């Protein structure tokens, strides 16, 4: 059986990338972990080229958590989104998803990046508008850290293929921007 390759991009302020790489490796995958260097314009250009090469070799892209660029300016995952809106990186990600049937996964800040990029829910990188689904500040206007219960209502995702329908899982949740906001037609 072929081993999938997982690309894990590292940005200033992200974390869990090495723990995630170890988890994928324990599950039988190969991993590529690359740091996005942004000290000079040349570093940025080189990083874009390195990321494109890594995406081209991968079947999965996994966006790690943390606080990319300190979640500034004005909210989380903007550094991720800006970098991946580069034309070369956008093209590489879209080929991964559309031509090679690749997968994307985001944890914490990485999930926020998937939403800000449009990969969730549209399946493509696109600009956000006023009607785009997003994650925003919690209604209590502060960080929340607690255990939450999540019920599996569909296992059509490869990430949930082994989950039992109807099963409830207790998971830790910790976030300052965890409130999902979308037009009514997106909500069920």
Where are these regions (language model features)?
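N-terminal beta1-alpha1 cap of cysteine-dependent amidohydrolase-like domains
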Residues: 1-107, 111-122, 134-144, 151, ...
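Pocket-forming structural segment of enzyme catalytic cores
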Residues: 119-188
């Amino acid at each position: 059986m072929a081993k999938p390759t997982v690309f894990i991009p590292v940005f200033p302020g992200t974390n869990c990338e090495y723990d995630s790489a170890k988890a994928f490796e324990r599950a039988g995958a190969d991993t590529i972990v690359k740091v996005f260097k942004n000290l000079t314009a040349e570093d940025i250009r080189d990083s874009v080229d390195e990321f494109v090469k890594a995406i081209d070799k991968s079947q999965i892209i996994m966006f790690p958590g943390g606080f990319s660029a300190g979640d500034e300016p004005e909210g989380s995952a903007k550094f991720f989104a800006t970098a991946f809106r580069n034309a070369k990186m956008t093209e590489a990600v879209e080929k991964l998803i559309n031509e090679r049937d690749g997968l994307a996964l985001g944890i914490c800040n990485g999930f926020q990046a998937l939403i800000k990029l449009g990969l969730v829910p549209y399946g493509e990188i696109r600009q956000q508008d006023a009607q785009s689904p997003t994650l925003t500040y919690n209604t209590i206007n502060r960080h929340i850290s607690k255990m939450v219960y999540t019920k599996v209502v569909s296992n059509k995702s490869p990430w949930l293929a082994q989950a039992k329908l109807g099963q409830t899982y207790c998971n830790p949740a910790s976030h300052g921007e965890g409130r999902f906001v979308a037009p009514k037609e997106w909500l069920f």
